[in-house]
């Protein structure tokens, strides 16, 4: 029998583990209370203990390498202005005390007495680098312009590795000497290149990282800090997605994204591949070595398993699930995985997609478009997808051109003036589905996926039965004008510049073609969204209503870019389901 939507939305997740200094406990995040909070569990197993008790989401937690204390991040109402808090020894204290600024935690000093982070404290726009003693005030150690994050703190405490981001697919790494304040560019390059997961070796002479500088895919590499040369350690065939180095330098844990699934690889500290544990199939992330470097904690999820924290003894132990996140009484055996398919598009390319099929032969279909656009639909656990499958829907998740996971060249196929080619890929997904007898088709997506929903409805109005736009972009010009200043700088290389490309951006924005929308539309947005301002939703709703179209609008006062709170998800998603049931069932007769 099908379960009500609320049951699926109450399926829990545990993720983001961090080891206590003695290696006996793991702190992690879980949404068991309805909003992600920090919890702790003994490594040997046992009942977990809640550590934070807030109404707002905790977005990250990290143990100090020394002493019984940790730092966690939290924002308010989805505004993404994360603040940093110290928790330990019965004390909970706001370290940042600057609610108007964004703070990105970068790590503890090796002695555990101070932290590093980047923040917009100075002017609200630029991410300066700060070091703060846990008992003192923040100190700017690098006054910057633009968007920066901290990749690693050298084991001897002498320098930081800082990432300067130019776009979602282009960044540089800098060495910041904490004694002199001198910065050194580590990754000179031309064009776009990513340098991810940087980890400094114990002797401070090299950095392990993942980069696509010298190829089409992101490969594992070792950067020599004296010569700046990079030795590549994996082939140029799939993206390396995770890199973590043990404290003693003995082990390097790596995973690659192979057709959306994670391929785990274990290396010795000198960069040579070693036999490793047999990991369960799924998507791995959040690698964290134990203080003694002999165990690895990680998060595992998959289409048929909700996220949980696992640990494994190295080099070849049996992975063990440490947390037991509830499936709300729904048997995991009812969860379905996708088929990996490819379909032809207008220029002869083959577009990869995940196709989730129910038992019904001629099911209504929801085409679910990922955001980004530099992102990828992967076979992770998605309660909404599983509900739709149980309800008799098929779900089709295409990775149209511009997606990551298939090489740098593929990611750039939708840049600026090529934007609408990705919308053509959506139209050809419908053609492929119709060839298989599937006629009643809705399109749904969030963030940039919401833009794709609106673009699909305006460019190809006859193909769609309904559309669901969640925190989506209706007008690329007003989006770039109103999003955060640092985000505008990151997004213009992808979408186009307001200064140079305004006319083109206006020509492809769905808001200027809203009269073409023929299918019923549902729009969902958070009032505090700092990425895609709520004015994007207001514009398209007003325009569709003015044109006499059918539109439902759900606005949540205490949310930002998406729905983080269970009470709001319990309100929104059943309404989305009712909307789809009504319009797709009507179309199917």
Regions found by a protein language model. Give the residues of each.
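Active-site-proximal cap/loop segments of hydrolase catalytic domains
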Residues: 400-589
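A detector of repeated loop/turn-to-beta-strand junctions in beta-rich toroidal repeat architectures
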Residues: 35-37, 81-83, 126-128, 170-172, ...
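Multi-bladed beta-propeller domains
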Residues: 1-14, 41-59, 77, 87-102, ...
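Blade-terminus and WD-like Trp-Asp/Gly-His loop motifs, strongest in beta-propeller folds
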Residues: 17-25, 61-69, 106-114, 151-159, ...
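Beta-strand-rich domains and repeat architectures in extracellular enzymes and scaffolds
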Residues: 4-39, 61-62
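Cap/lid segment of the alpha/beta-hydrolase catalytic domain
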Residues: 324-440, 446-447, 455, 459, ...
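Extracellular/periplasmic ectodomains of large secreted or surface enzymes and adhesion receptors
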Residues: 1, 244-249, 266-271, 290-294, ...
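Beta-strand C-termini and the immediately following turn/loop, strongest in propeller blades
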Residues: 26-33, 51-52, 71-78, 96, ...
């Amino acid at each position: 029998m099908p379960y009500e939507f609320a049951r699926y939305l109450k399926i829990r997740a545990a993720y983001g583990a961090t080891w206590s200094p003695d290696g006996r406990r793991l702190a992690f995040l879980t949404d068991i209370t309805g909003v992600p909070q920090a919890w702790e569990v003994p490594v040997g197993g046992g009942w977990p203990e809640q550590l934070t008790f807030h109404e707002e989401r905790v977005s990250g937690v990290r143990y100090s390498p020394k002493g019984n204390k940790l730092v966690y991040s939290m924002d308010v109402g989805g505004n993404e202005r994360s603040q940093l808090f110290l928790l330990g020894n019965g004390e909970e204290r706001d370290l940042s005390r600057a609610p108007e600024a964004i703070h990105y935690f970068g790590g503890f000093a090796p002695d555990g007495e101070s932290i590093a982070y980047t923040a917009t404290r100075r002017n609200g726009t630029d991410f300066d680098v700060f070091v703060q003693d846990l008992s003192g005030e923040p100190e700017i150690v690098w006054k910057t312009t633009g968007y920066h994050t901290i990749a690693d703190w050298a084991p001897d405490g002498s320098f930081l590795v800082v990432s300067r981001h130019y776009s979602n697919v282009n960044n540089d790494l800098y060495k910041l000497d904490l004694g002199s304040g001198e910065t050194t560019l580590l990754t000179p390059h031309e064009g776009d290149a990513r340098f991810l997961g940087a980890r400094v070796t114990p002797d401070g002479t090299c950095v392990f990282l993942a980069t696509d500088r010298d190829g089409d895919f992101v490969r594992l590499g070792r950067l020599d800090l004296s010569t700046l040369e990079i030795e590549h350690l994996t082939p140029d065939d799939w993206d390396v997605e995770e890199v973590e180095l043990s404290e003693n330098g003995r082990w390097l844990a790596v995973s690659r994204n192979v057709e959306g699934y994670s391929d785990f690889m274990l290396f010795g500290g000198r960069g040579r591949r070693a036999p490793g544990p047999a990991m369960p199939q799924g998507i791995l992330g959040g690698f964290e070595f134990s203080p003694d470097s002999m165990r690895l904690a990680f998060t595992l999820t998959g289409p048929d398993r909700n996220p949980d924290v696992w640990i494994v003894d190295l080099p070849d132990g049996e992975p063990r699930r440490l947390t037991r996140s509830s499936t709300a009484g729904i048997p995991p055996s009812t969860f379905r995985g996708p088929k990996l398919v490819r379909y032809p598009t207008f220029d002869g390319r083959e577009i990869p997609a995940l196709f989730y099929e129910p038992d019904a032969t001629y099911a209504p279909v929801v085409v679910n478009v990922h955001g980004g656009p530099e992102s990828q639909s992967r076979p992770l656990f998605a309660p909404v997808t599983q509900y739709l499958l149980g309800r008799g829907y098929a779900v089709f998740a295409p990775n149209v051109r511009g997606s990551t996971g298939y090489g740098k060249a593929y990611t750039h196929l939708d840049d600026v003036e090529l934007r609408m080619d990705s919308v053509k890929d959506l139209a050809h997904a419908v053609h492929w589905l119709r060839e298989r007898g599937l006629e009643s088709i809705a399109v749904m997506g969030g963030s940039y996926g919401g833009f794709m929903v609106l673009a699909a409805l305006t460019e190809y109005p006859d193909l769609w039965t309904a559309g669901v736009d969640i925190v989506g972009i209706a007008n690329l010009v007003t989006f770039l004008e109103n999003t955060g200043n640092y985000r505008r700088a990151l997004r213009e290389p992808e979408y186009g510049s307001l200064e140079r490309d305004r006319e083109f951006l206006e020509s492809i924005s769905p808001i200027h073609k809203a009269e073409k929308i023929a299918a019923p539309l549902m729009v969902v947005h958070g009032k505090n969204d700092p990425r895609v301002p709520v004015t994007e939703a207001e514009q398209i709703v007003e325009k569709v209503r003015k044109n006499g179209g059918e539109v439902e609008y759900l606005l949540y006062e205490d949310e930002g870019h998406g729905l983080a709170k269970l009470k709001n998800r319990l309100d929104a998603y059943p309404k989305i389901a009712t909307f789809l049931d009504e319009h797709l069932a009507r179309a199917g007769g």
